[in-house]
Amino acid sequence: LSTATSQAAPAVVVTDLVKQFGRFAALRGVSAAFDGGKLYAILGDNGAGKTTLLRTVAGLNRPTRGEVRVLSSTNHREICAQIGYMAHPSLLYDEMSGMENLRYYGQLYGIRDETRYELTIRNVGLDPELQRAVGQYSQGMRQRMSLARAMLHDPKILLLDEPFSNVDIHSAKTMVGLLVKIRDDGKTIFIVTHQASLLEGAADEFVWMQHGKIIARTLGLLPPPEVA
């Protein structure tokens, strides 16, 4: 597990966060602080509010009420610059090669430094596959390419929605290993997943959600009584 201390200012703070879609409240007054340099697993049933929380922290959903503070900032542009978001399903172009996908997103971020591309690709282990069309990738390779896209602008915080979805166990464990290394290099990582057992021994904290609220935070995978 990460050895990062909790004495520095939290990386992410949400205060009384509410998000409504029409009459449905997807988030119901969520307040929490998350330290930097840690890996958090966000768990709960479908409809618990996991992805909505992730998207709201990322700035993709505007909160109905409440505040999101990332690295002490509430400025939307500053927050977006510090966050890498991996969507589910992945936002990749099948007809383009892996490198073409990265360069497309790199242009959006204004990345011109070639070493940034090289380092990102090396970090996810996709060097030999860059010239192949993404449509020919296995699901595990697609997920690693999605992770590369999220990491390309060197954000301090990664928000990953179902990164282990539809991949075989070997690919999933490879992804977990990558994420642990990335966390150990100082990134803060939030992972929404229904495959919590993959993160046992890797996650610093398990965050349990139900009905749009965080109901418990545990150091181990044993669920709290409310969701047992």
Q: Which sequence ranges carry the predicted segments?
A:
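The feature captures the beta-strand-to-loop junction immediately N-terminal to the Walker
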Residues: L43-D45
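Catalytic Walker B motif of ABC-type/P-loop ATPase nucleotide-binding domains
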Residues: L158-D161
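H-loop/switch region of ABC-family ATPase nucleotide-binding domains
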Residues: V192-H194
